Amino acid sequence: LTQEIKAAARRQVADVGASALSLRAVSRELGMVSSALYRYFPSRDALLTALIVDAFDAVGAVAERAEAEVPAAEGFESRWVAVATAVRAWAVANPHDYALVYGSPVPGYEAPRDTVDPAARVSLVALRIVGDGLAAGDIDPRSTLPMPRPVHTELAALREEAAPGVPDEVLARTLLAWSAVLGAISYELFGHLHGIIADHDAYFAHQAHRTARLISAP
């Protein structure tokens, strides 16, 4: 029944948006009294958290599979592009799930700790690819632009937790590049390419390679 509740909630999010998610509406769709649904999800936020965790786990699994399917010998750029392309394909197939986790925050909702590890899965794949690229000599770690000290401090914490051995310069490029990947996906899904780019597949393929080279070259 938990899966049926979440499926009904996902349909409601697709129809009216996450901010309008209602346990009463979900219970009506399933023919349940609302008090019965509360035994599974005590609040709207609890149900919303379950949907968010599922979405992050789904896109994380997609990224992990894409990485695993490209031999390390093919190099950094091929692996990065494969993961970026797989994440975009998932987003195109599941636009409402993508919007739930990468779109505008839901007013009044504060994500609990339960969402942190699922949310990190895609980022950890990207950082692993970058670490391997550094070790293989595919990424030039030299810096050509001074970095503000506060940024060094923040990146040091990230490196210690998730990217040992990756220099601040390369971490900064990685954050910028992955932001560009998600930005390209969002521009496509939210209609901002309308009237500008017709061939979304070709455009994203180009963007994926450009973001890889943003990381590999100083």
What is the role of each PLM region?
Residues 4, 8, 16-46, 50:
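Helix-turn-helix
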Residues 4-11, 46-66, 82-89, 100, ...:
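Alpha-helical structural segments
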Residues 64, 92-100, 186-189, 216:
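Charged/polar positions within long, soluble alpha-helices
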Residues 65-74, 106-109:
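Helix-loop segments that flank and shape redox-cofactor active sites
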Residues 81-140, 200, 204:
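Internal hydrophobic scaffold segments of catalytic domains
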Residues 124-218:
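C-terminal peripheral helix-coil segments that are non-catalytic and often amphipathic
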